[in-house]
């Protein structure tokens, strides 16, 4: 297994699909990485040379991925909560942030139903 950005990439899958195993790299980004490095997206990782894998590593390193991306997202959410803005309050209360209705639905965000106390 090749290791790119601290993630073990599966050998028996196509390059584009394997790159999506990295947090922060989707299909579109993986295709762009393959295009800039000149690697054929249909070739499997096990068939790539060490030089090509190094090129992929270098190109992936230009993007914010894995732990850095997770940290960045959490810091942005924390900043909203510290500001006390509407979106921050919604995050703090565990409710939908982007204007969805909550009278019905929103069960995923709110969690399981709580029984009514008498």
Swiss-Prot record:
Q: Name one GO cellular component term.
A: cytosol
GO molecular function term, any single one? structural constituent of ribosome
GO biological process, alphabetically ordered = translation
Q: Where is this region: Disordered?
A: 93-118
InterPro entries for this protein:
Rbsml_uS13_C (IPR027437), Ribosomal_uS13 (IPR001892), Ribosomal_uS13-like_H2TH (IPR010979), Ribosomal_uS13_bac-type (IPR019980), Ribosomal_uS13_CS (IPR018269)
In terms of superkingdom, the source organism counts as: Bacteria
Keywords noted in UniProt: Ribonucleoprotein, Ribosomal protein, RNA-binding, rRNA-binding, tRNA-binding
Purpose: Located at the top of the head of the 30S subunit, it contacts several helices of the 16S rRNA. In the 70S ribosome it contacts the 23S rRNA (bridge B1a) and protein L5 of the 50S subunit (bridge B1b), connecting the 2 subunits; these bridges are implicated in subunit movement. Contacts the tRNAs in the A and P-sites.
User: What does the sequence similarity comment in the record state about its family?
Assistant: Belongs to the universal ribosomal protein uS13 family.
**NCBIfam families tied to this protein:** uS13_bact
Describe the protein's quaternary organization and the partners it interacts with: Part of the 30S ribosomal subunit. Forms a loose heterodimer with protein S19. Forms two bridges to the 50S subunit in the 70S ribosome.
Q: This chain belongs to which protein, by name?
A: Small ribosomal subunit protein uS13
Which organism is this entry from? Pseudomonas syringae pv. tomato (strain ATCC BAA-871 / DC3000)
Q: What is the lineage of its organism?
A: Bacteria, Pseudomonadati, Pseudomonadota, Gammaproteobacteria, Pseudomonadales
